[in-house]
Structure formats: structure tokens, C-alpha cells
């Protein structure tokens, strides 16, 4: 039974892969990406306010200096996702689903729609699920309520809203956000 559900999960992912892709910087030296990755910018609590984010000011200065907004490279999942990546993702998704049954009684269809996907939007492919599980699985043992679990993840993560991150032209990966501790509303929602 479980193996047949896993096989159906693989078919679900492959069947929905045609329009999935990553948008990544065209080169590793992209100045917009470098600002985020190097993160030597120290923010204050005011970063949540428009015009107060130092990251936002740094990104603005790039735009004003004539640096063209980056044209991201599109990489189609169908061309790069491997069988091993899918199997690893399905196994990890099933672990979460089985472990979190106490949180929500979701059907297999809901599992496929909300738990199984290996990406949120067009962020670079990553092992975000494994990283998140490693960091937050201990919370699954102690918190039964999904809303309280979400609040605990936010508290433990240390992530904060940063208005300037709205100007960042790429979607950060889980590990990039975990390193930054700052993100736009969209970034925080996908974290």
C-alpha cells in the first residue's frame, strides 16, 4: 500500500513538472546576488519599514548606478531533476506526512497538493525539506496544533521581515534565508 502511494507520488510530481523551473542568476558574480550571499550588511529592527532597510538601500544603489536588473537564467526541472532527487523528496515527504498525522488528517490528494511538492515557486532546486526537517522536527514531537507549530518555527528561525528584500530579483533558497535571517513577506511565507 505504502509503496504504491509512493509510486503514485512520483507520477504526480513528474506529471506536474512540465511547467516548473528555477530562476537563477546568470553568473555567480551577479552583484544583486552577491549582496545577499555575502550579507555583510547589518540590519536594525527598522528594516521592516519602507526606506529603512540597508539591504534595500544597497540594492537601490545598484539600480541607480546603472547596473541593469539581472536577467535570470531559467532552468527547466524536466531537464535537470533526477530520479534520485524525486525519490529522496518522496521519502522525505512521506516521513513528514506520517509524522505529522497528529497535526492534520489529510488525504492522499491533499498530501500530493500541499506536502509532496519539492518546490514552492521558481527558487533554485535544493534539499530544503531535509534541511527544514533537521532544524524543526523536534517541534513536531511537542506541538500538536498547526498554528502553534507555525508560530514556533517563526520564533526558532529568527527570521524577520525586511522591506528591502522586496527589491531582490530572485527567490532565495531555504538555506540562503536561514543564513540571512531576513526576507520579504513572500520569502517568509515560503520559508
Residue ranges of predicted features:
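Secondary-structure boundary elements
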Residues: 3-26, 30-179
Amino acid at each position: 500500500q505504502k509503496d504504491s502511494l509512493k509510486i503514485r507520488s512520483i507520477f504526480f510530481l513528474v506529471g506536474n513538472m512540465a511547467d516548473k523551473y528555477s530562476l537563477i542568476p546568470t553568473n555567480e558574480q551577479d552583484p544583486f546576488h552577491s549582496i545577499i550571499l555575502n550579507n555583510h550588511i547589518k540590519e536594525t529592527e527598522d528594516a521592516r519599514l519602507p526606506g529603512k532597510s540597508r539591504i534595500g538601500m544597497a540594492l537601490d544603489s545598484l539600480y541607480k548606478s546603472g547596473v541593469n536588473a539581472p536577467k535570470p537564467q531559467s532552468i527547466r526541472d524536466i531537464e535537470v531533476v533526477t530520479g534520485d532527487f524525486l525519490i529522496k523528496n518522496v521519502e522525505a515527504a512521506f516521513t513528514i506526512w506520517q509524522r505529522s498525522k497528529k497535526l492534520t488528517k489529510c488525504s492522499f490528494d491533499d498530501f500530493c497538493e500541499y506536502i509532496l511538492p519539492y518546490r514552492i515557486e521558481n527558487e533554485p532546486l535544493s534539499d530544503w525539506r531535509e534541511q527544514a526537517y533537521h532544524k524543526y522536527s523536534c517541534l513536531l514531537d511537542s506541538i500538536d496544533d498547526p498554528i502553534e507549530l507555525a508560530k514556533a518555527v517563526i520564533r526558532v528561525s529568527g527570521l524577520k521581515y525586511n522591506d528591502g528584500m522586496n527589491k531582490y530579483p530572485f527567490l532565495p533558497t531555504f538555506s540562503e534565508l536561514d543564513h540571512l535571517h531576513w526576507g520579504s513577506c513572500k520569502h517568509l511565507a515560503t520559508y
